[in-house]
């Protein structure tokens, strides 16, 4: 089915975990000749990222979780107002379908679409369903999940379960291409570790890695690190490396522009367990040590990591467990026997769905074909 002249609305915002999977789908829809418009919130991450690629419209929207009593009282009124404005926007755009990728902005747009009989697809990136998507699941035409979710039958009605599909997380094509490339773990004397602090950085991870390199060197483990610190921690982290030989450092940077190159370079990654990072590591076949963000809502990062850990493709340490001793207890055996890394890589590639974007596109075509 052709999507030519179909007006499809993408709504996602707040964090990269919502925005980047949505961008992957938006690009695929455009390649299929759909007219794509993004709806986000002003003064947010999507406002600085999306305009380079797509037309974006803005509505004001905010969450209620962990807010004061006044904001909780006024939230229903604001939601009703934003939903009404969203209805006007969708009519103006002549929307044929809305795809919500989470973030508070998805709420009013998807609710408005359901009210005026526009089909809605929602996509949940995490292994715990977020508050917005839990509400929207009642109104969605199709519910797409990235992971198998524990006790889903207790959260969804039989009607909701019937319209639920596990599709994985959309990731960039250059990362998907790594899935077909065999990782060769030789008996090289150097163990290449990619450290990802996330876009905002991860202070605890940034602080311990320089100490890990020093301790590893003392024990005869030769680590070379490519360390993405996040903008706020760059100078502080660089300072922590000042006494470490450059032979152990590939790069220390606030951001990595080309993640496919970084994933391809590494033998092992140490990172948080955001949905997109977990999906990219698995699809790229990169063994990981996940350190879930302790403050993540509903502990969703821990559950994201379990999809990989339970398939023997990675490890998970709570932040309070992230000691030099525990990290070395994982790294030392992997360094001594590289075949373990190779086996983990093979298992990682089998863990998650790599054609997620195409599966979501198929959902779009089926819905529009039946309208």
Curated annotation (Swiss-Prot):
Is Nuclease tagged as a keyword?
A: no
**Pathway given in the UniProt record:** Cell wall biogenesis; peptidoglycan biosynthesis
Its Enzyme Commission number(s) read: 2.4.1.227
Q: Which CDD domains match?
A: GT28_MurG (cd03785)
Q: Which Pfam families match?
A: Glyco_tran_28_C, Glyco_transf_28
Task: Please give, as recorded in its UniProt entry, the membrane topology of this protein.
Answer: Peripheral membrane protein
KW Cell wall biogenesis/degradation (keyword) present:
yes
An annotated GO cellular component: plasma membrane
A GO biological-process term? cell wall organization
Q: Which domain of life is it from?
A: Bacteria
Looking up Gene3D superfamilies in the UniProt record yields:
Glycogen Phosphorylase B (3.40.50.2000)
Q: Which UniProt keywords apply?
A: Cell cycle, Cell division, Cell inner membrane, Cell membrane, Cell shape, Cell wall biogenesis/degradation, Glycosyltransferase, Membrane, Peptidoglycan synthesis, Transferase
GO MF annotations, alphabetized: UDP-N-acetyl-D-glucosamine:N-acetylmuramoyl-L-alanyl-D-glutamyl-meso-2,6-diaminopimelyl-D-alanyl-D-alanine-diphosphoundecaprenol 4-beta-N-acetylglucosaminlytransferase activity; undecaprenyldiphospho-muramoylpentapeptide beta-N-acetylglucosaminyltransferase activity
> Which InterPro entries does the entry link to?
GlcNAc_MurG, Glyco_trans_28_C, GlycoTrans_28_N
Catalytic reaction annotation: di-trans,octa-cis-undecaprenyl diphospho-N-acetyl-alpha-D-muramoyl-L-alanyl-D-glutamyl-meso-2,6-diaminopimeloyl-D-alanyl-D-alanine + UDP-N-acetyl-alpha-D-glucosamine = di-trans,octa-cis-undecaprenyl diphospho-[N-acetyl-alpha-D-glucosaminyl-(1->4)]-N-acetyl-alpha-D-muramoyl-L-alanyl-D-glutamyl-meso-2,6-diaminopimeloyl-D-alanyl-D-alanine + UDP + H(+)
Residues where UDP-N-acetyl-alpha-D-glucosamine binds: 15-17, 126, 172, 199, 256, 275-280, 301
Query: Where's it found, cell-wise?
Result: Cell inner membrane
PANTHER family with a match to the protein in the record? GLYCOSYLTRANSFERASE, UDP-N-ACETYLGLUCOSAMINE--N-ACETYLMURAMYL-(PENTAPEPTIDE) PYROPHOSPHORYL-UNDECAPRENOL N-ACETYLGLUCOSAMINE TRANSFERASE 1
NCBIfam families in alphabetical order: murG
* HAMAP family (UniProt xref): MurG (MF_00033)
Instruction: Summarize the protein's role.
Output: Cell wall formation. Catalyzes the transfer of a GlcNAc subunit on undecaprenyl-pyrophosphoryl-MurNAc-pentapeptide (lipid intermediate I) to form undecaprenyl-pyrophosphoryl-MurNAc-(pentapeptide)GlcNAc (lipid intermediate II).
Q: Which family does it belong to?
A: Belongs to the glycosyltransferase 28 family. MurG subfamily.
Official protein name in the record: UDP-N-acetylglucosamine--N-acetylmuramyl-(pentapeptide) pyrophosphoryl-undecaprenol N-acetylglucosamine transferase
Q: Which organism is it from?
A: Francisella tularensis subsp. holarctica (strain LVS)
